[in-house]
Amino acid sequence: MKALLDLFRQVQQEEQFDAIKIGLASPEKIRSWSFGEVKKPETINYRTFKPERDGLFCAKIFGPIKDYECLCGKYKRLKHRGVICEKCGVEVTLAKVRRERMGHIELAAPTAHIWFLKSLPSRLGMVLDMTLRDIERVLYFEAFVVVEPGMTPLKKSQIMSEDDYLAKCDEYGEGEFVALMGAEGIRELLRGIDIEKQIETIRAELQATGSEAKIKKFAKRLKVLEAFQRSGIKPDWMILEVLPVLPPELRPLVPLDGGRFATSDLNDLYRRVINRNNRLKRLLELKAPEIIVRNEKRMLQEAVDSLLDNGRRGKAMTGANKRPLKSLAEMIKGKGGRFRQNLLGKRVDYSGRSVIVVGPTLKLHQCGLPKLMALELFKPFIFHKLETMGIATTIKAAKKEVESQTPVVWDILEEVIREHPVMLNRAPTLHRLGIQAFEPVLIEGKAIQLHPLVCAAFNADFDGDQMAVHVPLSLEAQMEARTLMLASNNVLFPANGDPSIVPSQDVVLGLYYTTRDKINGRGEGMTFADISEVIRAYENKEVELASRVNVRITEYDLVNPEADGDARFAPKITLQATTVGRAILSEILPKGLPFSVLNKPLKKKEISRLINTAFRKCGLRETVIFADKLLQSGFRLATRAGISIAIDDMLVPPAKEKIISEAAAKVKEYDKQYMSGLVTDQERYNNVVDIWGAAGDQVGKAMMEQLQTEDVVDRHGKTVKQESFNSIYMMADSGARGSAAQIRQLAGMRGLMAKPDGSIIETPITANFREGLNVLQYFISTHGARKGLADTALKTANSGYLTRRLVDVTQDLVVVEDDCGTSNGVAMKALVEGGEVIEALRDRILGRVVVNDVVNPETQETAIEAGTLLDEDLVELIDSIGVDEVKVRTPLTCDTRYGLCAKCYGRDLGRGVLVNSGEAVGVIAAQSIGEPGTQLTMRTFHIGGAASRAAVASSVEAKATGTVRFTATMRYVTNAKGEQIVISRSGEALITDDHGRERERHKIPYGATLLVHDGQSIKAGTQLATWDPLTRPIISEYSGTIKFENVEEGVTVAKQMDEVTGLSTLVVIDAKRRTSASKGIRPQVKLLDSSGAEVKIPGTDHSVTIGFQVGALITVKDGQQVHVGEVLARIPTESQKTRDITGGLPRVAELFEARSPKDAAVLAEVTGTTSFGKDTKGKQRLVITDLDGNAHEFLIAKEKQVLVHDGQVVNKGEMIVEGPADPHDILRLKGVEELATYIVDEVQDVYRLQGVKINDKHIEVIVRQMLRRVQIVDVGDTKFIPGEQVERSELLDENDKVIAEGKRPATYENLLLGITKASLSTDSFISAASFQETTRVLTEAAIMGKVDDLRGLKENVIVGRLIPAGTGLAYHRARKAKEAADRDRAAAIAEEEAASIFETPAVQQEGDA
């Protein structure tokens, strides 16, 4: 009996653990794991198929092959459990121990572990302070290393070749010093390291040295040594003396039919190691010559290398078929490795997949499940039911019953399935709406039926898509599926909070057609008492669907929200001017929505807005019912409408011929000009492309105008225009299918096509699809079509990879508390670009929590208290009282250490309420950004030539009426004519309304003439400033007499004659074309005052010096009198090269990877005055002198455009050299908020271009993760190393600890890491290893003896626990609390026991202690 109980005890062993530690194994540890030494390379006997004794599959070492049966068969069955057979030495136990028992190989010579040698940076090299090359020479027996110099002048760890060694032996005599070859030598060196002492010396040297390179090197070495010291791992364990052998079941040998065997590559690799090891042992016993032994040792080292990581060094070992063998390292890394294949993505039971078809009769929370599939999926449930009902006595009988599919089985299936949700998933699962739960409805047939409204969320269509079904088994799982995942509970997109259950295509068309109005329809102007009357008239063909009529309509207003049911609403009857269709549709309107929401043509956007309004006003349940009704009506009405397309619907505009012939004439004109040499080929090409582009647009416009309207006679007999009922136009206008651009190809002209390389072919396709294309036109258009397909394939892969990196960097970010109590936040304004409001303030702050009280600017009363979550009504209020800037909480400034707080995150967009604790907001953010990735383009845009010329603006005008305000950065001077000339680089003009709310803002460039002044009231359309778009001026900020310096004709400047006017100007020559003597000098101007002294910059003793850059046209003469604001020189900007603008997906990836752009802008490091120093070869030297008089130098390439000139005052972070911004500079000079704003805006630009809406906070969450590491500047009294990068939370914890002890905390600066880098440098080595660069991550972690606290989601998935998010967060918290309570209780009990032994009260003991 006891044995039986023991047997059960074996099974349930649930280990609780809170962390996982990784380290290096000592030889003793490896021997302690082992169940015996593997001495022979044999595997199994080819005749008996039994494993060879002491071989790689030995039953004595690894355990029996059959359960409870020894190898020779002497002991069989359970009763002998634990007996070791005296004949064959096998323990009688379960065969599955062969999966967990390890063996070992005692190596005859130590070998180095290749990971610590070759995984860069080489850890062995770091510890020994030797180069990788030298260590390799020693290990592979090409050189000796001095281990013990003795009394000789040799140094420890000195490398010498064999000849050297022999020479030194002769010189100093044998045995005076010890030098070894191979891993023995390295092992001795490692054993000889005194870590404590080394650390002290390095720390001392770190203090002493000033060189950057040295500090870096020392810090790296210090980190490794300290890790060894902390973790208690000895460095010489990096050299293996014992090799562990994997349990045989994990490297199986399977007999195939025909007497052959399939084997794991590891067996081959182990065999080679054992063979070479045995040969080496024999050679050592035989005292073979040194050279032979050496060779054998080298081969052993190589064999061990390829077992651990084949192909890392030298050529990979290959098997019989010339294929490289798969080593231990390859088993765990990559997509097919252990991590990604088996731990993160497992195949699951209780699942099936089938094709999907549309199920228009289903309710939103249902799906149609084929009977056969359901029978298979719910089999165990049916067996159980059959047994409890007594229909079948055993499982076997139940199985038979089910397989014969008797009627009773179907009844039971119905019963089992009722209220048991199933989960449907469509690959690729790009966001959380890719898996939703439904209640199954049994259907005939073999295809799953899917509700049409969830197609948008799944991105599914019915052209052969397949979906998988999963059954949640446990009660908890069913409950979660029902409450959290049911389709009717997921009606909003988590990415932007818009409804996901929007109808599309037919439904939209049906609803649109129903709600359109028609002039002079049958029965126009009739008045009806109620809707039933309208329906009667319509069914008797007295009125048309689109006729304008008057109807009495009952609306329900929400009067008391507290009551339940219909008591909340009060009916209100009004006479409405509407159409028949809208009146009929109003029957389905939920109570609480006014009729006005339906009283307009319902296009797709309108329907989305309608569902959104319903959700906010009427709640989830009503919305779902309403959406279902809309769907039914839409389908019915679309069928009744009978809209179809005929060739006559494609109306070709009569003006087309004229437009095309005019364009062709213009092109001819340009060809002529080119022939006569007036324009270059490039210019001609640009203009031709321009002309055809414009012509295409004109044809398109003419076509749309014709399609849009039609002439009808109204009931007074007048001819009027009304919106057209053309089928194609209706489809496009309603948003059901097609777009203006596609209609243009049908009935306008196809226009310009691109070659595969992206350049535009200059001959357009003038035909459209209605007229048909000729062969050439067809051929030209195939390019584009094919490129589109290739692009899509690439895009999908790239987008998937971006999502993977994003998920990886944010996976451990979970909402863990309600409020972190921070008073930080970010000030939100409306997003204005080019004078237009792109995103209103209300949209940006919706669903955020305000930091400070929002004050009404007119009455100064508090309108909204701090800490309030802004919902739709509150943003309305903010809008109406005229607040234009609100400070809101953001994930960026959240003070929660490991995770986020709910207040900083704000509204959970997928649910419409404040986010719940445990929500995995990181993953949601990553999915929201990654999911639309496939819609982004892959191309980079060439902007240049004609296209960019048209876009050059030369003035800016106000779009709104209001008051002009200049920003603090705006500086200007007034010239002799009284004009105000701008001399700032980053000045902006704002226009505010009467409330002082910003309506628009415009950048005003340097050198512009201001036409308005600060505080002036203006009307819309007033010009604010003008400038010359083609040149950039250099303007004098002081007045005086010009004195040229280094302006010598033929040396630094050249005379240029203008052919047309005959005037001459001086042009500064490029340094490359100057004589060698004049290379370094720079043409410049000084100003003299009336007494002939140099004019000084006020407040300093610097002379005003204005330098001219290469290409500048000098417009003043020597000795000329100039006034403030006068132009001294002009720099033509026309020479701008066409530049590629990275767009689409690559741009998003570039931003999140925090890559520094090439030719990045240079920002001023300090606030101060600029001047130019002496130029070096090819570089200009720019000096900024700060307010304390310290000079900061910048070297800038000559061809770069410097935006500042001598004597200009710049602010820290201001751009001084043109170019794209570098995010690292922004962070360093302007801080976290500026950086976040930059990244958010740039990413949003890309998505906005594609019409994708993503909430800002998702991008902020990613940026938070990119900023989660900091770099230590001053260590204070902490354990860190200068220059070390650590997790922000770890640093803050350590600082808190140090401050509590009254010591000095460490100071740090923020670090911006790209998402890949950030994922790899997380504290969790499990998460990092499963992401990328597995070898490097594990090597580093093992040396550090790292502990993974299993904080993130990924680590927990890998070790197979519940994730600490959602319901799992509560579980883990409860578990930890229980453990703590248990510990306390155990301690208390122990104390009581101790007290009772001494018969003294416990209190007294404590007192004594």
UniProtKB/Swiss-Prot annotation:
Catalytic reaction equation(s): RNA(n) + a ribonucleoside 5'-triphosphate = RNA(n+1) + diphosphate
Needed cofactors: Mg(2+); Zn(2+)
Protein name: DNA-directed RNA polymerase subunit beta'
NCBIfam families, per the entry: rpoC_TIGR
GO CC annotations, alphabetized: DNA-directed RNA polymerase complex
Cofactor binding note from Swiss-Prot or TrEMBL: Binds 1 Mg(2+) ion per subunit. Binds 2 Zn(2+) ions per subunit.
Top-level EC class as recorded in UniProt: transferase
Binding site for Zn(2+) 1: C70, C72, C85, C88
Species whose genome carries this gene: Ralstonia nicotianae (strain ATCC BAA-1114 / GMI1000)
Source taxon at top rank: Bacteria
The EC number(s) this enzyme carries: 2.7.7.6
Function: DNA-dependent RNA polymerase catalyzes the transcription of DNA into RNA using the four ribonucleoside triphosphates as substrates.
GO molecular function, one term: magnesium ion binding
Keyword annotations: DNA-directed RNA polymerase, Magnesium, Metal-binding, Nucleotidyltransferase, Transcription, Transferase, Zinc
Subunit structure: The RNAP catalytic core consists of 2 alpha, 1 beta, 1 beta' and 1 omega subunit. When a sigma factor is associated with the core the holoenzyme is formed, which can initiate transcription.
Gene: rpoC
GO biological process, one term: DNA-templated transcription
Family matches, as Pfam families: RNA_pol_Rpb1_1, RNA_pol_Rpb1_2, RNA_pol_Rpb1_3, RNA_pol_Rpb1_4, RNA_pol_Rpb1_5
Binding site for Mg(2+): D461, D463, D465
Annotated family: Belongs to the RNA polymerase beta' chain family.
InterPro entries: DNA-dir_RpoC_beta_prime, DNA-dir_RpoC_beta_prime_bact, RNA_pol_asu, RNA_pol_N, RNA_pol_Rpb1_1, RNA_pol_Rpb1_3, RNA_pol_Rpb1_3_sf, RNA_pol_Rpb1_4
Binding site for Zn(2+) 2: C820, C894, C901, C904
